[in-house]
Amino acid sequence: MKLCGFEVGLNQPLFLIAGPCVIESLQLQLDTAGVLKEITSKLGLNFIFKSSFDKANRTSGSSFRGPGLEEGLKVLEAVKTQIGVPVLTDVHEYTPIDEVATVVDVLQTPAFLVRQTDFIRNVCAVGKPVNIKKGQFLSPWDMKPVVEKAKSTGNSQILVCERGASFGYNNLVSDMRSLAVMRETGCPVVFDATHSVQLPGAQGGRSGGQREFVPVLARAAVAVGISGLFAETHPDPPNALSDGPNAWPLRTMAMLLETLVELDAVTKKRGFLEQD
């Protein structure tokens, strides 16, 4: 499958989707995107910048949600033109999808909306590549009918993204078998290494996270074999306005990615026995 001008798949090198969880300011987005572009260019890693203009599913109604559609799209367009990288953002049921699609290169559907049939079809019908996040409440096998809904629109540029599964209250676990199962959808599989370490609602009015396990799960996923890695990053995670506890520090992103690129090459060198 071709995505933003490059090929993706298990027979292709790993690609990266990364950026701050939410748009905090134009300068933060430009600075972060610039650093990520420099890192990925040195590693020969294809890169898509991501950030959200509206976080509609915050734990608390008083939490920062983002700058909104109009300002958010201006920021994403600035990143795209000034830094020279493709951009991704998520949309919601109330979002004017066509308007967003005029700016971004990839659309993303939130995990909580994965079972909303009309929403999935409406997003995919626009014709842009779509990253569909698997709900925390969904088995990997249940992504197959979701993809069938998506592709019924005629859009074949569909990614499926694993972001952990609910495990009791306020906790997520990552079953690495799901990455192999989700390949059966016929879509490139992306692993979200940062939301997978989230502790939903674990800090009362906001979610917690265990960012120390981001490299652990990222290495495991790459060793299993994935097409892409999704990772939210921030220059100052403790002061990030959304999902700081599970954001990976920008200053150590290069070190993490160096390891993952090397591991990806080894993993894909001889193919996958489970597919024989």
Curated annotation (Swiss-Prot):
Membrane-spanning residues: none
Cellular component GO terms, alphabetical: cytoplasm
Record keyword Membrane present: no
Coiled coil: none
Pathway: Carbohydrate biosynthesis; 3-deoxy-D-manno-octulosonate biosynthesis; 3-deoxy-D-manno-octulosonate from D-ribulose 5-phosphate: step 2/3; Bacterial outer membrane biogenesis; lipopolysaccharide biosynthesis
The reaction(s) this protein catalyses: D-arabinose 5-phosphate + phosphoenolpyruvate + H2O = 3-deoxy-alpha-D-manno-2-octulosonate-8-phosphate + phosphate
Molecular functions (GO terms): 3-deoxy-8-phosphooctulonate synthase activity
UniProt keyword terms in alphabetical order: Cytoplasm, Lipopolysaccharide biosynthesis, Transferase
EC number(s) from the headed UniProt entry: 2.5.1.55
Alphabetical GO biological process terms: keto-3-deoxy-D-manno-octulosonic acid biosynthetic process
Record-linked Gene3D superfamilies: Aldolase class I
Pfam families xrefs: DAHP_synth_1
Keyword Phosphoprotein appears in the UniProt entry: no
Main location: cytoplasm
Protein localization: Cytoplasm
Record HAMAP family: KDO8P_synth (MF_00056)
PANTHER family in UniProt: PHOSPHO-2-DEHYDRO-3-DEOXYHEPTONATE ALDOLASE (PTHR21057)
Family of the protein in this entry: Belongs to the KdsA family.
Name of the protein: 2-dehydro-3-deoxyphosphooctonate aldolase
Gene that encodes the chain: kdsA
